[in-house]
A protein has these predicted regions:
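N-terminal leader/linker segments that precede catalytic domains of diphosphate-processing enzymes
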Residues: 1-83, 90-116, 120-163, 176-181, ...
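Short glycine-enriched loop/turn motifs at secondary-structure junctions
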Residues: 166-172
Length: 215
């Protein structure tokens, strides 16, 4: 029904005169609705969202070296607002080469997006792992999916942070380093400190951090 570089709309006719419209990032031969159960279980998501935690040494509140959740302010065009967001991006074809392990493309994408959106590179001291391999955003209207990947930055400074790596239509407006108490307040309030709503992936990152599931 419609096709652009990043979005397509398909008419899923599930029985005679019964139609369901699906907004997707996928080509017709890769639609999730047409996959078998086994194909569904093995598929890669469209994108990766990153839960990025800065974990300086001397980890305790009294020392002032408390771990923080690193988030950014990204303009999301359908909302018309800068939203409190996690570093995230689509899986590129080159992320899927050279390894049969389904987690490898997720890790590669997460590391690339961290560098593009924050200027930071993962080092041997840091840890990267998959939290969830595939989550659906809004399955009532789209088959778009994201993996959640944890990146723990085990370092005493975040020197070199920058948003100059933005590509395409990406627009950023700074970073937020949230303590556990600040993240908990945003969860309880349902909005950020500016009174702006946020995405379900931001909610997931806040919850994961506050619950100490990253440790």
């Amino acid at each position: 029904l419609f096709e652009s570089k990043f979005i397509k709309v398909f008419d899923l006719q599930y029985r005679e005169d019964r139609h369901y419209y699906n907004a997707t990032r996928r080509d017709e031969n890769d639609l999730v609705a047409a996959k078998s159960t086994e194909e569904f279980k093995k598929m890669l998501p469209d994108a990766v969202s990153c839960v990025v935690i800065w974990n300086p040494s001397g980890d305790d509140e009294k020392s002032g070296h408390e771990p923080c959740l690193l988030m950014n302010r990204e303009f999301r065009y359908p909302t018309g607002q800068y939203l409190l967001s996690v570093p995230a991006g689509l899986i590129d074809p080159e992320d899927c080469t050279g390894d049969n392990d389904n987690t490898a493309p997720l890790i590669k994408t997460a590391m690339r997006e961290l560098h593009e959106e924050t200027g930071l590179k993962v080092t041997e001291k840091d840890t990267v792992s998959v939290i969830n391999p595939c989550l659906f955003s809004t399955p009532g209207m789209t088959d778009e999916s994201n993996a959640l990947v944890k990146i723990v930055l085990n370092r005493d400074s975040l020197n070199g942070m920058s948003q100059e790596g933005a590509v395409g239509g990406e627009l950023f407006d700074g970073f937020d380093l949230l303590t556990k108490a600040q993240a908990k307040k945003i969860l309880e309030d349902g909005v950020d400190e500016h009174g702006i709503y946020y995405s379900v992936y931001t909610w997931a990152a806040l919850t994961y951090f506050v619950a100490d599931l990253w440790r």
